[in-house]
UniProtKB/Swiss-Prot annotation:
Swiss-Prot/TrEMBL keywords: Glycosyltransferase, Metal-binding, Queuosine biosynthesis, Transferase, tRNA processing, Zinc
Gene Ontology MF: a single term: tRNA-guanosine(34) queuine transglycosylase activity
Gene: tgt
UniProt organism field: Aromatoleum aromaticum (strain DSM 19018 / LMG 30748 / EbN1)
Protein's recorded name: Queuine tRNA-ribosyltransferase
Sections of the chain in a coiled coil: none
GO biological process, one term: tRNA-guanine transglycosylation
Amino acid sequence: MQFELLAQHGAARRGRLTLAHGTVDTPAFMPVGTYGTVKAMTPAALADTGAQICLGNTFHLWLRPGLDVVAAHGGLHRFMNWDRPILTDSGGFQVFSLGALRKISEEGVKFASPIDGAKLFLTPEESMRIQTVLNSDIAMIFDECTPHPATHDEAAKSMQLSLRWARRSRDEFDRLANPNALFGIVQGGMFEDLRDESLAALDAIGFSGYAIGGLSVGEPKEDMARILAHTAPRLPAGRPRYLMGVGTPEDIVAGVAAGIDMFDCVMPTRNARNGWLFTRYGDIKIKNATHKQDTRPLDPSCDCYTCRNFSRAYLHHLHRAGEILGSMLNTIHNLRYYQTLTAELRAAIAAGDLDSHAARFRADRSTGAC
């Protein structure tokens, strides 16, 4: 993996990430393909939105279809017919989400499969082995996502466990001679001193890139902003910086301004399936009756397949009728919106115009789509 910084404006960075399956211009948004597919999208349609890289889920692919199936195809790229880069998360967040169904120990996490109830055990070493079989361009260390709320002692204990797992992840990744990139994940809850301790220890281990984890897990927006503002500028300058699971268009603009290079979130795809669509001038709830006879496109400034070919009235009809095509067209639009958003941010950084661009973005979004 190579990472090149091409331009900076304040803390914001314009870069290029070179990976085994291609290059990624940053800041970049990564659509989430949990089960080896971005919901309601073909790989060709996903590429047409401008997606340079997508995210796969180690935990879910391990459970279904299973590693033997993916391995028989030579890895996740051929299995899902996606020839661009893939990042896989480690499974830590999904295990965290199981709640009472899982038991965390020093060795790893015991849990009941959400599919058939089978007893399973996921460790840092197993996560690295799974991600090596998947052959993702970027793998993530196995960590514990610190819950919110957490006391300082609780967050410290969780963070220290994640650091021990980070060391084990690094060692196993190297033992497997995985040629791809491995990213560390900074934890520490809502406490700046713990974030600093986590980052220092991860930096000492050494990773290809560094992610900020444990945000957008239910904490107030002001806490997320505070931890982001504290942590982002302290991440190693010559490595890509990844803000996990975030977020809204406004979150992405704020993250870029803070120096973040990579983002992922289910929001554009999940919202699309629920009829919540993003536009330059605010959000549209396509199910609302006001769109029943509206012949306009969702967003006249958008060049996506949906906006070039279909009216709001048609999308309203599809949503009301429960047609699968509605989810497909909505997802195409939302993902193209996110790719356009990050492309414009890249251009603004290169032009030294990010501050005024961000101000225009906020003004436009507050106008309200009509």
